[in-house]
Every structure is written in C-alpha cells, then in structure tokens.
Regions:
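A cross-family phosphate/adenosyl-ligand binding-site feature
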Residues: 1-118, 124-210
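Conserved small/polar residues in nucleotide/adenosyl-binding loops
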Residues: 214-216
Length: 216
C-alpha cells in the first residue's frame, strides 16, 4: 500500500514514545520505508535498537554520527521523505520548531524537509494549555505544519485531562491521508447549490437551471 513511500518519525522525550514503536511496525507492514529520528532525551524512554529492529533502518540520534550511509544525512533523508510525523512532540521540541532552532538530528532534518510535516503534542495538561505552548502551535500551523490535537484521559502524572498522545491507528490515519489517498480533486473549486441558480446576462435577462426536485 505504501511501497515507494518514505516516512520520517521524529520521537522526543515523552513516556508516550512507546506508542511509536507500534506505529513504526504498522507502517513497515504496509511496505513503507520508515526512518526514525530520536532526540537524546527520547532514548531515556525507548532504545533506538527497538526502532532499528522494526524498520530495518538505522535509528539516528546524533547529528555527527559517523556511521551513516549518506554524505549529509539530514539533507539526504529530508529530500526522500514524503511526510514527517513528530510524535510524541514535547513542549520543548515544539518551541524549537516554531522558531527554526536546529540543534539535533530531528530538528535539523525537519527544517530541511519540504514535504508535509505533522506534529502530535504530548504533555501535561497545564503545559499544553500554557499560552506559550499554544502560541508555538499556532505559529507552526502558520508554517504549514499540521497539528494533531491530543487526546483526553489519564496522563503519566496521574492527572486527567488533555495531553495524551492519540492512539497509533489515529496517527497512522493522518499519515495515510497524506500519502496513500489520491488527491485528484486538489485545486478544483466545486459549487454546491440546493436549488435553481440564476446568472444575470443583463438587467433584464438571466440564465437559470431547473430545480433538482430534492426537497428537505
């Protein structure tokens, strides 16, 4: 289904990082070429070997890792990507992306990508609702990022509220919507009318059409 498509998964330092292992597996089973980039903090929650085993690709954390196969890894990978999903996205990484800071492999590669970029915030409710975080998310949308609203439920801190990373199927659906569905209507303007229309020729005459005979 996704053969020939390349997806970058950006994983940041959140307890919800474990969900991305399952997402990576789901994408791989759809024959997608999956590359995982992790922040250093993310490695405290899940080991890079997990992603390497699931995707058959090297999981990159260090920008200056000399064991990569491309000359300029972050640029080469960015050129190949069809979509980037950063999930879970911490408040820290969201702030970096909102202001173009590129100080690790994940943020550097994202900045170099020209494809669709999707961010899925995951954090404490108060952190998510903080005016600064909300402003950063709004700023990302102004730069053509798509933001997935967090789910509501019990968080790692035992609070109940919004801030949970959505389930893997929801995240997968966002990716599929972007790269697996034909967009043959993209750029086409469609007019929907509930009855007869009239277009003036001059102050006296007009062109019209019959009613559809559909009544509500």
């Amino acid at each position: 289904m996704l053969k020939g498509k390349t997806v970058i998964l950006g994983v940041t330092g959140s307890i919800a990082a474990y969900k991305i292992a399952n997402l990576a597996s789901m994408l791989t089973k759809l024959h997608c070429d999956v590359h995982v980039l992790m922040t250093q903090n993310a490695t405290n929650f899940i080991h890079p070997i997990t992603f390497e085993t699931l995707t058959n690709n090297k999981c990159i954390v260090d920008t200056f890792d000399r064991n990569f196969q491309y000359n300029v890894e972050h640029v080469s990978l960015a050129k190949r990507a069809d979509v980037v999903l950063i999930a879970p996205a911490t408040a820290n990484v969201i702030a970096k992306l909102a202001y173009g800071l590129a100080d690790d492999m994940l943020t550097t590669t994202t900045l170099a990508c020209t494809c669709k970029k999707i961010v899925a915030p995951a954090m404490n409710t108060n952190m998510y609702r903080n005016a600064i975080t909300q402003d950063n998310l709004k700023r990302l949308t102004q730069f053509d990022f798509e933001v997935i609203a967090p789910a509501t439920g019990m968080l790692a801190c035992k609070d109940i509220g919004e801030g949970k990373l959505p389930d893997e199927q929801t995240l997968l659906n966002y990716i599929l919507k972007e790269i697996a569905m034909e967009k043959d209507m993209k750029g086409v303007n469609v007019l929907v009318t509930a009855g007869a229309t009239q277009e003036a020729i001059d102050p006296v005459r007009y062109i019209t059409n019959h009613l559809s005979l559909i009544h509500i």
